[in-house]
Amino acid sequence: GLIPGAGGTQRVPRLAGITQEIMGFLMAGTPFTPKKALSAGLIHEVTDKDNLIEAAKKYILDGGKAVQPWDEKSYKFPGGLPYTPKGMMIWGAASSSLRKMSYNNYPAQSAILSALYEGVQVPIDAGLRIEARYFTKVVMDPVSQNMVRSLFVNMQALNKGARRPKEFDKYDVKKIGILGAGLMGAGIAYVTAKAGIEVVLIDQDQENAEKGKDYSVKLLDKALSRKKTTEEKKEKLLSLITPTTDYALLKGADLIVEAVFENREIKAEVTAKAEAQIAENAVFGSNTSTLPISGLAQNSSRPNNFIGIHYFSPVEKMPLVEIIMGEKTSQETLAKTMDYVQKIKKTPIVVNDSRGFYTSRVFGTYTGEGVAMLAEGIKPALIENAGKMTGMPMAPLALADAVALDLAWKVTTQTKKDFEAEGKDFPITPMYSIMEEMVDKQGRFGKKNSKGFYEYPENGKKYLWPELSNLCKESEDQPDVEELKKRFLYIQAIETAKCYEENVLTDVRDADIGAILGWGMAPWTGGPLSFIDMVGIKDFVAEADKLAQKYGERFTPCKLLRDMAAKNESFHKSGNSSQAA
């Protein structure tokens, strides 16, 4: 959320010139390898740590200068002056790239470009003053303040175990069992073995279990081809994964992670088989993304050791793990689980049990709002562009396809059955009708079968399914894109506030970090609760009421928000990010 304000925007171009690569380095934070930095002229020499002192001495003895290049009388700007006709061509392209990359949501990136453009046209002392002014402007911007608080201060706190119960000793997980060798189970096996933990990967037949291990082989072969690992490290990691059908091999496991299909009967069966083999104090974690943990724990002989461990796909890339506390989950089990998550170098958030927990529940509002807009007759392309313009990593309909429409429909139909079993009315909305049409009648499951809201040709780019305009008749009057952007952000923030009110969330850090890392909520907001604070609680509630009048009760602010508005409170009070003010 900040700019490199200690001279970075002025020294870098004077060392390496103004190129597209340098623009990416400064504006997007694109990392440079030492070799790349050397070739760009950003550093003098690359050496290993054992030879560091000798290299420094040699640099001095060989006539290394204390004078910076730009202070030399003979200095020439690398690649030619940036304000010549040739040099000026780069700025137009940079402005276009910035717009495409950020949709003007990030003040820091705009400030970097301005500091570069203005600073390289004057002597460096004046350039540094220009940079300092832009740095001050960015520091005072609420977007930067939100990002620093969420992505630096609060994320560091969570990574260091801020939510871990302190009264328990460190739990050293040395062996785990993974039940289910599908995509999730295979990914969990890889990140766990990478942390040096022995893995027993179980599936119903040996071939599937072997395929699960092969996933690690493919990832390691790719890393090997990119020189990110060695053959020795590859073999060491693979030696830690044992694919099998034999539950007896779970003996001695400190932790079990169940990653089978979202089916209560199958989960109950594998739970019983695993618990028959493991120690009384071992932790049993379920990777369910939607089924309530307390219900699954009823099939456990030790519900106090039962906990939800929700990974995100692909496991090896996604940095978040959502830990779900069941009604009977003990604090010791939470502490043990957090020690494991810390060991595999993921960021943990802790939530209480409910349908969809936190991340799946709120994530669904983003894609659901996209489908609702479609039902209103809003053009699909406008919906998709508005989603990306809010700062979301993917457009809503494309994201729904990627997650799988049939999976979302299964969750919806299961929820409907559960509502009916509890004697509650399940609302049949236009969204429900569209999903029923897409999955049950059209057989469009999303990217997985190459047809969803988009078509996925074997050779070529995906494109919106042309028949969508017939499925949902387009309205003649199309809304302003700013209205759509507002809906996408507000619906996520409102549902998050409901989670906080219902005690699903108990810490605002979990809410904000979980949203950004879990489903990619626009990082410039700092997360959904930071977004509410940035808008201002009174203004947020007033605007939400307007949206509710126009689009339905899903936008109606919950009692917590109304109470906070009456007292003019905020979620992040000064000096304390763990609870509402």
Please annotate each region the language model reported:
Residues 2-581:
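N-terminal glycine-rich phosphate-binding loop for ADP-containing cofactors
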